[in-house]
UniProtKB/Swiss-Prot annotation:
Family of the protein in this entry: Belongs to the bacilliredoxin family.
Name of protein: Bacilliredoxin ABC2448
InterPro entries (UniProt xref): BrxB/BrxA
Pfam short name (any one): Disulph_isomer
Gene Ontology biological process terms, A to Z: cell redox homeostasis
């Protein structure tokens, strides 16, 4: 069992590293979420997870978005199942949407504008997720 825990810790850390190296700011507490998501401007939130579709589809799409011509003001991430209070607080901002991970939420002035939910990620190609994210930021971040 201890070996499994070590393995999972490595998986979690690698998933965190993927997002930090892509240029996203980790929000690990409810207070950090509150401080950032209530700011004026646009924020892309990536709800990270350890599932296969997060690693194979969502995180690569998230990384791509840092290079897209239209940019939100902030790129942040919370980690479902790991930073539970931060994730729960972030989800309170996602009114009208159920809990979903991995997922992306785009907020403007603290208000949810749109989401790309797990069902729009799982089983899709990364480029399809990128296109949904591009459409969202083109609509709300220009």
């Amino acid at each position: 069992m201890q070996q499994f825990n070590f393995f999972m810790n490595d998986v979690v850390q690698e998933a965190r590293n993927d997002m930090v190296h892509a240029g996203y700011t980790e929000l690990k507490t409810a207070e950090e979420v509150e401080e950032v998501l209530t700011q004026k401007g646009t924020t892309l939130v990536m709800v990270n997870s350890v599932c296969g579709c997060a690693g194979g589809i969502a995180r690569p799409a998230a990384a791509y978005m840092k290079n897209y011509e239209t940019q939100p003001d902030r790129f942040v991430t919370v980690f479902a199942g790991q930073d539970k209070e931060a994730t729960a607080r972030a989800r309170e901002f996602f009114t009208g949407y159920g809990p979903s991970s991995p997922s992306f939420a785009l907020l403007k002035d603290g208000q949810i504008q749109t989401m790309v939910e797990r069902h729009e990620i799982e089983g899709h190609e990364p480029i399809e997720v990128v296109q949904k994210l591009e459409q969202a930021v083109d609509t709300y971040c220009k």
